[in-house]
Amino acid sequence: MSDIAITISLLALVAVIGLWIGHWKIRGVGLGIGGVLFGGIIVAHFTDQYGLKLDAHTLHFVQEFGLILFVYTIGIQVGPGFFSSLRKSGLKLNAFAILIIVLGSIAVVLVHKIADVPLDIALGIYSGAVTNTPALGAGQQILAELGVPQTTVTMGVSYAMAYPFGICGILLAMWLIRLFFNVKVDDEAARFNAESSQDKESLHNISLKVTNQNLDGLTLIQIPGFSDEEVVCSRLKRDDMEIVPKASTEIRTNDILQLVGDDNSLAKMRLIIGYEVDAPTVAYSGEIRSERVVVTNEKVLGKKIRALGIHQKYGVVISRLNRAGIELVPTGNTTLQFGDVLHMVGRSDVLNQAISVIGNAQQKLLQVQMLPVFIGIGLGVLVGSIPFYIPGFPVALKLGLAGGPLVVVLILARIGTIGKLYWFMPPSANLALREIGIVLFLAVVGLKSGGSFFDTLVNGSGLEWMGYGIFITFVPLIIAGTIARLYGKLNYLTICGLLAGSMTDPPALAFANEIKEDNGAAALSYATVYPLVMFLRIMSPQLLAVLLWAA
């Protein structure tokens, strides 16, 4: 067999062994995808003993391409929610997540400066301690740019030393915070549910009876609130007649209007129109029905709702729009993106015609448009290769193969659609590509570092590196968790999701969810901080490398 064939065969063997190890669980906690790294270490130990030669160029390509695939799919996943997570509702949680990252970075500086740990090893320990594999790839990239040799081996070994406690340390921090503050989980869940019902920003339906005499004879568009497009009127009931109103529909006293909007906007409409009634909020008449429709027609992508003329042509109202899990009040200026879910209301005989304009082709949601994938990867690699200079730094900075694709795809996923191209990927396809990418990357890291792993653990500084990893994992989590509880007054279940999200650690999220299975506090806070944290986890080792190299 050729060296390339042997190399690829061993990579497959590493993946099989590693994924098998990752499925081992102790009390519900396992290594997960990190098992591939240890699979690589085991295989590398025996390849060294038997003198098998691996092709270095193949390993290098597979490692870099795996990292690019992983980072790209992460960006596609979190891109639509990345910028919205920075809004006011998530500022406090993201601030605490940033605090954890900053404290972890300070811990790395202390380990490097006080304990005199080499920079490449310190960054490897950091990546393992925070269980973030893209951080490992980003650190290796920047150190290679700085001219540090053999970073794959040293960083891979130190990463492997710190990784196991990186997973366990998060769970231990959750348990200690619960113990220290004497938390009663049921009380925390009840408090979260009560606060959620008060603060929830999702859209609601109400029906208002027109009692304001000043509105009699006005068209819908002339009434404040409708003209500002703060709310949508999905139905109008007059006596026994029920219609989907247009902007030009005249309003009469005693008409009943069904409105859709957020709580604040609906409260304003109560003051303008009249009092709330129960009558038509649930049942639709035989002539009027509603449908949830997914935007899949490439001809409408990037167009404004007003330009489609759906309301004017068919008398159909788009009352809600769900984009990446976020509910919006659609206006005439709202631009449609692939995968948007619209709530459409109209007469049965014309609603299907309006739906055909939007698309609603479910099979398209299962297809992957490959052209945008390679455009995103290509642009990302180019952006990652562009040097930018900062005064006082010894070398030009680059985003690298980890940061470049991430930044580019975050922007593209946020834009969503350019012409007929759309940056949308079905969750199953995204997960498959992401898993393939990270398995390839970790398999190579394990193979490259496995030869020296056991020697470092038994005869070298392996146990010392584990200690530094525990310090980097544990101290930031405990400090931030305590401050969040003591001064931030955060719910304990929310803190658990925050801690898991700050480490981008799905096993920790699973553990947090099991604390109170019927409560969504942990998952919500995890999702809120995840996009920003993933970005900062990839950028932080690069900044640390340059700052400590220049110091």
Curated annotation (Swiss-Prot):
PANTHER family: K(+)_H(+) ANTIPORTER SUBUNIT KHTT, TRANSPORT PROTEIN YIDE-RELATED. It is found in: Cell membrane. GO terms for cellular component: plasma membrane. This is Putative transport protein CGSHiEE_03135. It is a multi-pass membrane protein. NCBIfam families: PRK03818.1 (NF003007), YidE_YbjL_dupl (TIGR01625). Keywords: Cell membrane, Membrane, Repeat, Transmembrane, Transmembrane helix, Transport. InterPro entries: AAE_transporter, RCK_C, RCK_C_sf, Transpt_YidE_put, YidE_YbjL. The chain crosses the membrane at residues 4-24, 28-48, 65-85, 95-115, 157-177, 370-390, 402-424, 438-458, 463-483, 492-512, 529-549. One of its GO terms (biological process) is potassium ion transport. Belongs to the AAE transporter (TC 2.A.81) family. YidE subfamily. GO terms for molecular function: monoatomic cation transmembrane transporter activity. Residues 191-275, 277-360 form the RCK C-terminal domain.
